[in-house]
Amino acid sequence: MPKKLDIEKKTIAISMLCEGNSIRGVERMTGIHRDTIMRLAVRVGDGMKKVQDELFTGLDTDRVEVDEVWGFIGAKKATVKRKALSKDYGDVWTWVAIDAESKLVPTWHVGGRTFDDAYVFIGDLKKRLVKRPQISADALKSYEGAIEDHFGANVDYGSIIKTFSHTALERPQRYSPPEVISIKKEVKQGNPDVDKISTSYVEKQHHTLRMHCRRLARLTNAFSKKRENFEAAISLHYAYYNLVKTHGTIKCTPAMEAGKADSFWKVRDLVEQGEAAV
């Protein structure tokens, strides 16, 4: 029977994962078997999803930015199609909402990039807010119907439309992002402050996610093999981001800035609270 990990070893392993290390990298540095690390990460991630679901409600939020970030499970979409792989494999999108002022990420949704996913995501956002927000999104059409269905007339909603250079995609440096050649803002509903229609903060959060969650880092062989592992990793990242890590702009955690935490959490708190919630 494998030896049970003590809280110190659990904390070290989770800290390493939250700072962007891979499962096998943590195994090499700690001597803890990769399967044990994975089971621990799933338990803590699943538990912290429940903790955050309960904690991040009743939010007095003025401005919210929403966007989606791409990833994949098992194999990319083209490979799944070419090799006729399991339907559980393929592209996956993480829908993210961020409070533009506190920088809190109160909700996210892992799924496809469909109206049904937008509907679930926006519905969860709506139930966490206590007043009329300004919502900024990109030009994805699914947002329009989802926001109208859940918020009705009680929202100020604008979209930011970026036009990219197609020639940038054809350059030899194919991994470089395409050049943005124009940006247009559109009022979709209500009376949003046009100057504050933006997705800059949520796009920056995507960068933070990719830096801190190894399975979303670009151009590596680190990726999720199972949907439940992916979802737990996303939850673990946002627990660390919201509750533990000092945000460079606000000089505290987003949860503290939003009035949902009195002090900095420690990674040990994530482990203990997460395992207790499962």
Range-by-range predicted roles:
Residues 1-278:
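Residue-level recognition of single "structural anchor" positions
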